[in-house]
């Protein structure tokens, strides 16, 4: 602290202030107050030599907090048990039956009513041992397997918010009346998460649990489900679009294998594809809100990879139109699995199998076994051609 004595008078001495090193913060012609006694001192703080530029200290603090609070990944053995060996790896060549190529999105929702026991049974019949399902909480705290917040799309019901209802209120609603195969699937009901997991574990079907909502009940419900069913640690992964929700779940139980889901414009638009871009805006009639959501989309696109690593994820589930070979290599270097959704066209499935060499989530299982045979034949023929070329080179060298 610098110490400077104030003189009585109308103006301070300019000469003293000009050559004094202890009063650098005082103006040369600053007026002095008559009422101030001559013995009064004014304390002037000096600027520290270690003060960081504006914003740099906040940035360093944020980086430190990021690395201090980042969660660790779960046991790699559990990750391997769920997702199997990576395509193209030595483990995959040694154990081709354990390679995951197709994951039934919502239990193959185009072939059977989505997120129902009938859909999961259909997957078992089609020899698909990996499904994805969605989970929400009800008013009574139970976890129901359901994607939408309402039931208008799946049934003729006018219910718009199931979180305000109990299980007894919706358990008898037919959710297959609007499905394309409704003639085959009649009187299809919703199911609770416990019912679905009981069946899937019995049939040794692995699953990805997509958590919908960010309330405390769903977080506690997922953690409790894993605690009561230890087999899930090696057969189920938890995913979410909201990294904060996934962080809460994995912080409460770090043994849970986590995955982050991502697609562009998830804040401002309900749908997205590469051909049409973002469609069906959430607040299209409110321009200020729409602009704010677009800004959040921009921040999300810049930060979602950091938030994924912050949550200690073992896999990322990306919209198929955002995935490239560079994206696949990036996550493989980090030891993180990548899967795309939703890949339904036969040509797209072959592209994912043969070029990207990564698993995908599909709404239909039509032709999956045939594609696997085609890929196996192509792989065998490619290896045969390579061996033939090597043999020819060796013969030429010997000759």
Could you tell me what each predicted segment is?
Residues 2-8, 12-18, 22-399:
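Phosphate-group recognition and catalysis centered on beta-loop-alpha active-site segments
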């Amino acid at each position: 602290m610098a110490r400077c004595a104030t003189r009585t008078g109308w103006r301070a001495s300019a000469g003293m202030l000009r050559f004094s090193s202890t009063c650098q913060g005082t103006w040369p012609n600053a007026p002095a107050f008559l009422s101030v006694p001559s013995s009064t001192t004014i304390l002037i703080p000096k600027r520290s030599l270690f003060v960081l530029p504006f914003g740099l200290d906040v940035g360093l603090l944020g980086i430190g907090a990021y690395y201090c609070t980042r969660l660790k990944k779960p046991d790699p053995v559990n990750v391997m048990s769920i997702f199997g060996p990576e395509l193209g790896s030595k483990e995959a060549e040694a154990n081709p039956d354990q390679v995951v190529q197709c994951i039934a999105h919502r239990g193959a929702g185009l072939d059977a009513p989505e997120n129902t026991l009938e859909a999961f049974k259909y997957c078992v019949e089609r020899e698909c041992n990996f499904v994805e399902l969605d989970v929400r909480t009800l008013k009574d705290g139970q976890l129901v397997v359901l994607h939408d917040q309402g039931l208008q799309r799946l049934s003729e019901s006018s219910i718009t918010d199931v979180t305000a209802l109990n299980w007894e209120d919706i358990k008898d609603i037919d959710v297959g009346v609007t499905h394309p195969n409704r003639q085959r699937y009649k009187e299809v009901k919703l199911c609770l998460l416990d019912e679905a997991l009981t069946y899937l574990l019995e049939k040794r079907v692995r699953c990805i649990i997509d958590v919908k909502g960010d309330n405390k009940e769903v977080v506690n419900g997922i953690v409790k489900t894993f605690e009561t069913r230890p087999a899930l640690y090696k057969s189920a992964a938890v995913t979410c679009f909201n990294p904060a929700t996934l962080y809460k779940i994995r912080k409460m139980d770090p043994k849970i294998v986590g995955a982050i889901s991502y697609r562009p414009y998830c804040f401002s638009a309900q749908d997205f594809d590469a051909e049409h871009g973002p469609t069906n805006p959430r607040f299209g009639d409110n321009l200020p809100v729409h602009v704010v959501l677009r800004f959040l989309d921009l921040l999300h696109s810049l930060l979602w990879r950091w938030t994924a690593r912050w949550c200690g994820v073992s896999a990322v589930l990306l919209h198929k139109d955002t995935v490239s070979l560079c994206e696949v290599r990036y996550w493989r270097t980090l030891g993180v699995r990548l899967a795309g959704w939703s890949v339904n066209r036969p040509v797209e499935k072959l592209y994912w199998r043969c070029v990207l060499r990564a698993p995908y989530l599909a709404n239909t299982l039509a032709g999956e076994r045939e594609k696997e045979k085609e890929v196996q034949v192509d792989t065998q023929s490619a290896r045969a051609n390579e061996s033939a070329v090597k043999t020819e080179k060796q013969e030429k060298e010997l000759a």
